[in-house]
Regions:
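Short, well-formed alpha-helical segments that are part of the catalytic scaffolds
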Residues: 20-25, 41-56
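Short beta-strand/loop segment that forms part of the nucleotide-sugar
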Residues: 38, 51, 59-68, 86
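Short aromatic/hydrophobic "clamp" motif used to bind/position activated sugar donors
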Residues: 109
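Hydrophobic helical membrane-anchoring modules
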Residues: 2-3, 12-31, 169-171, 194-276
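A conserved acidic beta->alpha catalytic loop
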Residues: 65-73, 116
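Cell-envelope/extracellular polymer assembly enzymes that use nucleotide-activated donors
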Residues: 33-35, 60, 204
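Acceptor/aglycone-binding surface of glycosyltransferases and processive sugar-polymer synthases
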Residues: 88-103, 121-199, 226-243
């Protein structure tokens, strides 16, 4: 069975029936509410799979719609009537994420792409890391247990180089920089500034949580191929954009870092979008 068929049916990637829920360990029985933010533009064909893999104990799903014309919003509401839809007013993934973060009410926020490349059932691992003491749970395709079906040799090399630069410049220990499947405590929204509207916002977050002295834990994650549609990623162009973000950030020496009470993400003034 091909991925196209899998994307259209409520079944797993290998053809097996997905469980009605993902068992949670006993220490997660009192997990705080979890919000999942999904930026989407013309992802109607992929949403059935994305929504189906989300654990049933998720408190809230926030779909940030980038003016889709293929019925993305209608599909989302049909699949999950309680979905919170935010109409993105600006452009870019960073703008979409900032709009989504502002609309979240959960104590934990998870970032998930709408193309079906991320397995929603991995969210339990992210939440477990946060409940166990991490401030920021960073997905990694190259940590032990992770993997990817969607990375060319040039992208892999570029990611490795950019990751090495960030680790050297900011004292991080990342194994995967350019991967946006992350989760964090909502109180983090009070402490760092996100002033990037493009996809580079993910790199900016990765750098600034380290600069702030937050506890970061990598989570092994498997990236799958996009189910439907074509990715607009361009290895060289996008790599240069990420490099610019890295170079403009000022590193803070380890000796002067202190662990803050919280991490702030200051949302720019003015309306980010309309929730419905």
């Amino acid at each position: 069975m091909g991925r196209q068929d899998i994307g259209r049916q409520d079944i797993g990637r290998q053809g097996q029936e997905l469980p009605a829920y993902r068992p949670i360990s006993s220490h997660l029985a009192i997990t705080p509410p979890v919000s999942v933010v999904i930026p989407a533009m013309n992802e109607a064909q992929n949403l059935p799979y994305v929504f189906r893999t989300l654990p049933e104990w998720i408190h809230e799903v926030v779909l940030v719609d980038g003016d889709s014309t293929d019925g993305t919003v209608e599909v989302a509401r049909a699949l999950r009537p309680d979905v919170k839809v935010v109409a993105q007013r600006g452009k870019g993934k960073g703008d979409a994420l900032i709009s989504g973060f502002a609309a979240c009410t959960g104590d934990i926020i998870v970032m998930v792409d709408a193309d079906g490349s991320a397995d929603g059932q991995e969210i339990v691992s992210y939440v477990s890391a946060l409940v166990s003491g991490a401030d920021f749970a960073k997905g990694s395709r190259f940590a032990n247990g992770g993997g990817t079906d969607d990375m060319t040799a040039i992208r892999k090399l570029g990611n490795r180089v950019l990751c090495a630069v960030v680790n050297a410049k900011f004292g991080a220990r990342y194994t995967d920089l350019c991967y946006g499947y992350n989760a964090f405590w909502r109180h983090c929204l009070d402490e760092i500034t996100l002033d990037c509207t493009g996809f580079e916002v993910e790199t900016l977050m990765n750098i600034r949580v380290v600069k702030a002295g937050l506890k970061v834990q990598e989570i092994p994650s498997h990236e799958y191929d996009r189910i439907h549609g074509v990715s607009n990623l361009r290895a060289v162009r996008d790599g240069l954009r990420v490099l610019k973000v890295i170079l403009r950030e000022r590193g803070v020496p380890r000796s002067t870092r202190r662990r803050p009470v919280a991490l702030r993400i200051s949302v720019p003034a003015g309306p980010r979008g309309e929730a419905s």
